[in-house]
Amino acid sequence: MDMLLNTARAWGLRLDQRQIEQFARYSAELRAWNTRVNLTAITDEEGIVARHFLDSLRCALSWGDAPSSLIDIGSGAGFPGLPLKILRPELRVALVESVGKKAAFLRHMITVLDLRDVTVLTARAETVGRDPQHREQYDVVTARAVAELATLAEYCLPLCRVHGRVLAPKGSDIADEVARARTAIERLGGRVIDVEPVTIPGVEPRTLVVIAKVAPTLAAYPRAVGVPARRPIH
């Protein structure tokens, strides 16, 4: 876990001994569960630290004013939501994962890591986005490797409060994807404020798309389950 500690420190993020132990346990449990549930193609500890933990923690440099709540869309094995919860234990976190076996892993990790104020929602993002308990209730919305940005915007922006942020970790060559998504982002009440380069030791260059929520999302969005992916807003 030296790379985790040292890179986090270089980014100005402090991790204490308990947090390092939580990350070590997370890595071990992820590898154990991965033998029976398809959670990740990355199974060596160094890869898990670099491509999952550090890629997740990098979001904390871009979430603006200290948030009190975060929702992670398509959480899968918990990235980036759970590492950000470990980093900031005071965060109220919701993890949206529609696949039952992956949701079971998330609940297991919450128990094993003794995390408080974390909810797992076994549902589709479109359904959660229409629920008054969740709609426009979160300071930060994250989503990693879920969909193209135009579709992702329709999953995420309805859940983000005005003045909050959507953070979308992406690969390096995304200029065209961002351009295709601008109409959708603006219609949903957002604005792209940055596309930040991300450098992680041993990992190919990545980016983080930062979207500010500048206006409420129209009641027509999100559309029915499956529609944002089949017919993105253009």
Swiss-Prot record:
Keyword Cytoplasm among UniProt keywords: yes
A Gene Ontology cellular-component term: cytosol
MF term (GO), any: rRNA (guanine-N7-)-methyltransferase activity
Database matches in Gene3D superfamilies: Vaccinia Virus protein VP39
Record keywords, A-Z: Cytoplasm, Methyltransferase, rRNA processing, S-adenosyl-L-methionine, Transferase
A Pfam family matched in the record: GidB
Protein known as: Ribosomal RNA small subunit methyltransferase G
Organism name: Roseiflexus sp. (strain RS-1)
